Amino acid sequence: MKLYRHLAWDGIRKNSRLYVPYLLTGVGAVSFFYILVALARLPEGTLPGSGSVQVILNLGSFVLWVFSLLLLFYTHSFLIRRRNREFALYNVLGMGKRDIARILCWETLLSGGISLAGGLALGILLGKLAELGLLRMVGAATDMVYRVSAGGLLLTLGLYAGIFLLILISSLVRVGRSTAVQLMRSQAEGEKPPRANWALALLGILLLAGAYYLAVTIREPLAALTWFFAAVLMVIAATYLLFISGSVTLCRLLQKNPRFYYQKRHFVSVSSLVYRMKRNGAGLASICILGTMVLVMLSSTTCLYFGAEDSLRTRYPRDENITAYFPDRASQSGDLTPLRTAVADAVRRSGMSAANVWEYRSVSSVMTLRDGVLSPNEGFGNPVDVTLIPLADYNAAMGTDLTLPQGQVYVCRSRTGYQGTSLTLQNGPTWQVAGLLDNFSPSGSDSASVVTQLWLIVPDLSAADDLEQVMNRANMGVSRSWYYGFDLDRQLPDAADPVAEAIRRMAQDGGLMENGVLGVESLAENRGDFYGSYGSLFFLGILLSVGFSLAAVLIIYYKQISEGYEDQARFDIMQKVGMTRRDIRSSINSQLLLVFFLPLLLAGLHLAFAFPFVHKLLLLFNLWNTRLLVGTTAVSFLAFAVLYTLVYRITSNAYYHIVSGGGER
């Protein structure tokens, strides 16, 4: 037993160039996962909006575990490929498959033990720092209590031990099915270029074009959410197809160009790429996809976090947002003075005063707009939230003195691109558009609508009768409401609003409305949930972006190291026939520049076309600040490009060190 343990440890030590990054990957994955599950298990009340924060963190931990499974399997394949010759020699020298299996068991036990112990220790060590960072991001109070989650430790230990067990089973199956000759040849065996390259390339182009078309043509946020994951799958498939088949096609075209191919700096690099292009293309595609994930995730979550106040103020434009819903026109058209007086009394009893009052009545319904005709939305076509506001309420709210004859409407351009000269109700009257207004935006719950909104200023509420008749014929109704919002003369602490509580108590006692329902939304009460959700998304975005970036770096490193060992013999031969070290460096730069920056360029292209998608998805969070999203996207790409270039310089030097004779054979 000691012999097998010694051989396993000796194998890890001799292949430290490959094993150290693998072990660091395991340690990092385990520590990141433990931190997420430990944060999701913080005591109740520690985080604002703890329900949504826990859901986000648990979802993130699941994504991280699945990603860890794929990444550890991927990196372990490089180790096994490098160790195959060693296992073949053991077999030739008299060791049976069972003996090799015992060595593999010890290697997995050692590497898994180091990863689990180191990862849990690092996770516990950094757990408090991560907790303080999360609490700061969500705007919660911090404490100095050091917590260790026993449940998080057990869950992390069980799930990641399962990953290493699966890796062991995969290695045993691979070695068990191979002969000594196959193991000996596998390390140096080239790969045949895939067949039907043009067909695969064309399929990849079509898939990518389809995904890009969806990204730039979808207008509705809900439709963007529906099609987003389909577009992501299309982009992933297209990226793999283009890198695998397109790289082969590119190499063949370069080989057919004698002036390019038969140069010292190009001959070795291009010829070696052809024999491993399937694996090389898959690695480049993985780097591209990881880079795109980092860019999209970091730019969107950063935009959400720094735009949280804008989003909060869009959803809750006043400190207190009161909406009364009426069952019919008579109650909506009645005297609203008692409601205003009761609200003012509640504010006064709380020791505060109201300011910046904003109020209006409205009648709304979900319809379909096509060629200037409004019809009931019965599940077909894109929905449009149509809202009618009487001119008197608009003039009072905006301080204007507009006039409007019967049969005409003003169109508010907020969130709608309607440019027609008239609007016709299905089987109803036609309204002429008297003009476009720019300075009126929805408030209260109306601001949370994620469908296209069409706000119409009508002469009076009688115009809504025609709308109600059209909707009633389709067995659909309208919503009649009155919005009353105001700011308070001093800022309230988060999650505490005595004014909102007083108004709710009055509504529950039946002293405010005889007919209808009254709803109260407080900015102070909801601020904690907003910052809790957005802050935790930003925290998760940073954590996963770091993880995905390290994964991309790891793939680049293993790609360079493994290809360096494969190319070592080729460059050794070329040196013997006259190639200098300067020629080797020039050839290496030619090879790396040929394929290395393609993932970065394509990731940038993916990000550019994903921008409209991301923008529409952020509208679901009431974030309309396009300029902020442009800024975070640009900064994210520049930062990732700098990191990518640094990794390129470091790994190209490691590759050169190996092929020029500095690495072990």
Identify the role of each PLM range.
Residues 19-23, 58, 153-158, 198-202, ...:
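Hydrophobic alpha-helical transmembrane segments
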Residues 38-50, 120-152, 209-226, 599-662:
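Short helix-loop junctions at transmembrane helix boundaries
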